[in-house]
Design a protein with these regions (language model features):
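Active-site nucleotide/adenylate-binding loops and adjacent lid/helix of ATP-dependent enzymes
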Residues: 37-118
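Conserved N-proximal alpha/beta basic substrate-recognition cap immediately N-terminal to
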Residues: 1-62
Length: 118
């Protein structure tokens, strides 16, 4: 019986759980699907929405949208008031998290999140 006490990429994202399942090794904790979904913050928020659970308002921003930063900033500002917090969808814990109090800080935070996202 394996007790996976791992954190972050490959430890919490379903990778190691999938390896255990392929090798038919019993382990404790969440399975592959639950681990993979919960590691991705956007997927988790979508599921929480579908379940009707209240959560903070969020604006998903995809990496390819960052080519038109003015549009992204306008989209965020149309839905949220400053300060806003930016978090990569697939980075662990507080890695890549930034607080932005204006449009310039938001641009910087979005670029930083894109770099830190796994």
């Amino acid at each position: 019986m394996i007790f996976p006490v791992l954190h972050g990429l490959n430890g919490e994202d379903g990778t190691i759980q999938g390896l255990f399942e392929l090798a038919d090794i019993p382990y404790v904790g969440c399975g592959v699907l639950a681990s993979a979904v919960s590691m991705d913050k956007l997927y988790t928020k979508i599921i929480v929405d579908v379940l009707g659970i209240n959560q903070a308002t969020y604006v998903p921003v995809m990496r390819d949208e960052l080519t038109d930063m003015a549009e992204v900033v306008a989209s965020v500002e149309a839905k949220l008031n400053y300060p806003v917090f930016v978090k990569p969808s697939n980075a662990g814990s507080s890695k890549g998290v930034s607080k932005a109090t204006n449009s310039q800080e938001l641009e910087t935070a979005l670029h930083y999140a894109a770099v830190e996202d796994s």
